[in-house]
Amino acid sequence: MVYAIVRAGGRQEKVSVGDFVTLNRVAGGAGSTIELPALLLVDGDKITTAAADLAKVTVTAEILQDLRGPKIVIQKFKNKTGYKKRQGHRQELTKVKITGIK
């Protein structure tokens, strides 16, 4: 089994060919192809971690759609002063399909 650890959207993800992965927003529209930098490559019993060897490895992915994560609510409250603050946030995400590890 071939899989790679890639850096994508400020995080590290374990991916193999055919996987669907949700990342922090990546530039590009639906249908475009992106390359992700590999940090580790496992091909059966062979493990590659050397930077010189990983520079030759390309992990390609196809952008499927841009979406938004669930809404989270942030609240601040200070007792006895009447101070209240409420804020919401939805993270911008991109869903990709891993198309190749070479």
Swiss-Prot record:
This protein binds to 23S rRNA in the presence of protein L20. InterPro entries: bL21-like (IPR028909), bL21-like_sf (IPR036164), Ribosomal_bL21 (IPR001787), Ribosomal_bL21_CS (IPR018258). SUPFAM superfamilies: L21p-like. One of its GO terms (cellular component) is cytoplasm. Part of the 50S ribosomal subunit. Contacts protein L20. Signal peptide: none annotated. GO terms for molecular function: rRNA binding; structural constituent of ribosome. This is Large ribosomal subunit protein bL21. Belongs to the bacterial ribosomal protein bL21 family. PROSITE patterns: RIBOSOMAL_L21. Keywords: Ribonucleoprotein, Ribosomal protein, RNA-binding, rRNA-binding. It comes from Pseudarthrobacter chlorophenolicus (strain ATCC 700700 / DSM 12829 / CIP 107037 / JCM 12360 / KCTC 9906 / NCIMB 13794 / A6). One of its GO terms (biological process) is translation. It comes from the Bacteria.
